[in-house]
């Protein structure tokens, strides 16, 4: 266990490049608020609101979920400002391997959802442990996915939905369908470590990936110190930007896979920049979620084709921004939210 790891500060990208935060007024003058309808219910939402912020190096996306407070959401703002005001790090690769994402739909809807993805699906992340559903629902969904994709790599994401005993029972059954890893099956780091030990003892092939234990933790490196995961799932926005996420991966010394926070192509481009900058990338990234949206802010969405996404910049379309714009009351709510998060970020940067 490496006990010398230390968490980089919020606003790390600006610290690292010795760049001041852009003035708040400039940020607000270049802010566009949108609401994008979705084709399926995902994490209980049918549409996605966000604020796009444009600067000298492009646009960033500020899209913390509506229930998040300023303290948690400030990392998302740091990411958006870094994307808009700082150059992207030099990439290691220009094509990103992706997984498709299957929401917790009934088994009979699996072929319909998978048909929305272009080309061959080589890796699929399946949502399980949804509130109000049963393990039988999870098994049926995974079985339907395996029937539809006999050669694809499958992985499941429980979003902390199982108990320790329930997770072990679920993995015994789900491993029959050849899943390669389970993402955040339980809530606590202690239970993650116990589950990892238990499945190794039973010889189950699935690995354990940490998501919420990293992106929602005050100390995102605690899971690595506790040897509670085989790999880490990282998201640029909740971790405060590409540079801070890369620093966390370097310190944790765990394989990493990048996932989206359900953003438009603007936010996905930031996630792709993070994936492109990782020293190694063993698994497909969860950046194919634009396919779950009925619209996008650009004429050329960042979507997967045959399991890969090309690294490229995204320019929002003025016509789409106008069509997807929120009403003025909602826009003002986002302005106030950005302002509150900016104050948190300002303090973190010592300004």
Specify the residue positions occupied by each region the protein language model found.
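Glycine-rich, proline-tolerant flexible connector loops at the mouths of alpha/beta enzymes
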Residues: 61-71, 122-139
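Flexible C-terminal active-site loop/helix
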Residues: 2-32, 36-48, 59-64, 83-86, ...
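Catalytic core of soluble alpha/beta enzymes
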Residues: 131-270, 275, 295-297, 302
């Amino acid at each position: 266990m490496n006990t010398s790891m230390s968490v980089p500060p919020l606003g790390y990208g600006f610290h690292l490049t010795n760049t001041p935060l852009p003035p708040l007024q400039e940020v607000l003058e270049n802010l566009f608020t949108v609401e994008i309808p979705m084709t399926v219910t995902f994490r209980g939402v049918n549409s996605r609101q966000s604020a796009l912020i444009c600067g000298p190096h492009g646009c960033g996306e500020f899209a913390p979920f509506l229930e998040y407070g300023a303290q948690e959401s400030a990392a998302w703002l740091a990411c958006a400002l870094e994307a808009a005001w700082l150059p992207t790090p030099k990439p290691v690769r220009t094509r990103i391997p992706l997984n498709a994402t299957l929401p917790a739909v009934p088994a009979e809807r699996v072929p319909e959802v998978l048909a929305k993805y272009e080309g061959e699906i080589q890796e699929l992340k399946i949502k399980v442990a949804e509130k109000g559903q049963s393990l039988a629902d999870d098994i049926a969904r995974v079985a339907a996915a395996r029937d539809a994709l006999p050669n694809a790599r499958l992985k499941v994401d429980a979003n902390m939905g199982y108990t320790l005993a329930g997770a072990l029972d679920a993995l015994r059954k789900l491993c029959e369908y050849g899943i390669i890893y389970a993402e955040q099956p339980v809530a606590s780091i202690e239970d993650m470590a116990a589950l990892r030990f238990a499945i190794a003892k039973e010889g189950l092939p699935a690995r354990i990936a940490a998501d919420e234990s990293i992106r929602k933790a005050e100390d995102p490196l605690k899971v690595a110190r506790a040897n509670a995961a085989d790999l880490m799932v990282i998201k640029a926005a909740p971790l405060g930007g590409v540079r801070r996420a890369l620093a966390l991966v370097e310190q944790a010394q765990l394989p990493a896979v990048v996932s989206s926070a359900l953003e438009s192509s603007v936010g996905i481009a930031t996630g792709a920049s993070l994936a492109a900058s990782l020293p190694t990338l063993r698994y497909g990234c969860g950046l194919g979620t634009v396919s779950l949206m009925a619209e996008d802010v650009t004429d050329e969405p960042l979507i997967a084709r045959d399991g890969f996404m090309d690294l490229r910049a995204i320019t929002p379309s003025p016509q789409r921004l106008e069509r997807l714009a929120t009403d003025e009351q909602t826009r003002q709510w986002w302005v106030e939210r950005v302002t509150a998060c900016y104050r948190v970020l300002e303090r973190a940067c010592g300004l």
